[in-house]
């Protein structure tokens, strides 16, 4: 039994007040600097909505509470957790327009605009979507309106006040870290509209901190090689889609080789890029052990992306000799396998042979390789062209479980 159940209302109000004050004190929308404090508040608030514990509490609006918790996680860079917290909710569940707009942004637009019953909310959501697709002034206009409403203290009720206060912070975060802003700043010469339109279908409005860090490190500007180390599930796959799109936009005649040293990974990539290609207008083919090695030259000529294990590509290399100079980008996935006694030799040998061809750029990906700078230098890149992030989309807890004996 929770010690504060007899004063549950007071404790909950204290949590809301604490959240409000932390956000208000945070300058320049740098909410990540207050992560530890805000996570504690979010975890305490989540207790009020958990199925196991919510029966202990009465008088708490659990729907709104979920939104507040999701907002905190969104602001500190845990968008995946925020989306999970809101799963099963509907934009029309919320009683104020600011709360509905918070839901729309934090969930990545996880609703059909035509399903939004409140016309003002629908209009605001359309303004945000229009900004994402065109880069117009809609976001600035909407942000100015919300800030002015908050400053002039014009609210319908207490819920409207609190939700507007949260929306101010959500809009500030969104304005700073949305896809359109980050991509245009990193590469203003590329038309990102189709890529952003595809991202909207995946309910993605912004990059994860690890992805944004890689872009700011030069992912979209490197000349020869860029190496990226980030934990599993931190967004490496989305990074490859981004770079493939940029490469084909910059050079429509380019070909891209995606080296996946595991057959299971090759099969997974084959299915994924078949779907991605339909959205981004490129074709892909895959060759790997267990699949056919006979690829019609016309089909290969048509394909913009070739997915292969290093071993399979080396078998086909002689028949692909004329095609080799067409590859302008090579993506090296699971790069830590270069150190594998079984697969590393073939992987390293193939990369050594490809390095002799001028004009090829390399994106090297790994979750755990320790000497990422040295690998990037070996590929011909600079030591600075490296993205190294320890960000994970959700915290990981490690524990030892023992039975009958003491591990210590």
Tell me the role of every PLM-derived stretch.
Residues 1-408:
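N-terminal helicase ATP-binding lobe
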């Amino acid at each position: 039994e929770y010690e504060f159940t007899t004063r549950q209302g007071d404790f909950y109000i204290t949590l809301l007040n604490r959240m409000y004050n932390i956000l208000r004190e945070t300058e320049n929308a740098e909410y990540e600097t207050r992560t530890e404090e805000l996570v504690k508040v979010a975890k305490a608030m989540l207790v009020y909505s958990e199925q196991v514990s919510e029966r202990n509490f009465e008088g708490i609006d659990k729907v709104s509470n979920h939104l507040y918790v999701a907002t905190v996680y969104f602001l500190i860079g845990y968008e995946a957790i925020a989306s999970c917290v809101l799963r099963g909710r509907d934009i029309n569940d919320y009683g104020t327009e600011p709360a509905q707009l918070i839901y729309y942004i934090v969930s990545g637009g996880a609703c059909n605009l035509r399903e939004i019953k409140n016309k003002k909310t629908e209009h605001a959501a359309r303004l945000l979507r229009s900004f994402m697709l065109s880069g117009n002034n809609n976001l600035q206009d909407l942000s100015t309106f919300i800030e002015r409403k908050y400053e002039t203290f014009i609210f319908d009720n207490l819920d409207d006040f609190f939700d507007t206060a949260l929306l101010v912070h959500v809009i500030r975060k969104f304005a700073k870290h949305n896809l359109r802003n980050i991509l245009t700043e990193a590469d203003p010469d590329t038309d990102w509209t189709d890529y952003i339109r595809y991202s909207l279908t995946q309910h993605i409005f912004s990059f994860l901190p690890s992805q944004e860090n890689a872009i700011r490190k030069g992912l979209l500007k490197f000349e020869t090689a860029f190496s990226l180390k980030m934990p599993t599930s931190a967004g490496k796959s989305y990074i490859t889609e981004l770079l493939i799109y940029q490469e084909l936009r910059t050079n429509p005649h380019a070909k891209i080789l995606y080296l996946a040293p595991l057959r299971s990974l090759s099969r997974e990539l084959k299915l994924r890029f078949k779907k991605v290609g339909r959205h981004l207008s490129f074709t892909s083919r895959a060759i790997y052990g267990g699949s056919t090695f006979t690829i019609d030259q016309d089909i290969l000529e048509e394909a913009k992306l070739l997915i292969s294990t290093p071993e399979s590509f080396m078998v086909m290399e002689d028949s692909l000799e004329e095609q080799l100079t067409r590859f302008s980008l090579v993506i090296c996935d699971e790069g830590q396998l270069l150190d594998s006694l079984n697969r590393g030799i073939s992987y390293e040998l193939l990369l050594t042979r490809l390095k002799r061809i001028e004009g090829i750029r390399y994106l090297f990906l790994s979750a755990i390789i320790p000497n990422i700078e040295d690998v990037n230098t070996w590929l011909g890149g600079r030591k600075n062209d490296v993205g190294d992030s320890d960000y994970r989309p959700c915290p990981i807890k490690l524990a030892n479980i023992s039975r009958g004996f003491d591990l210590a």
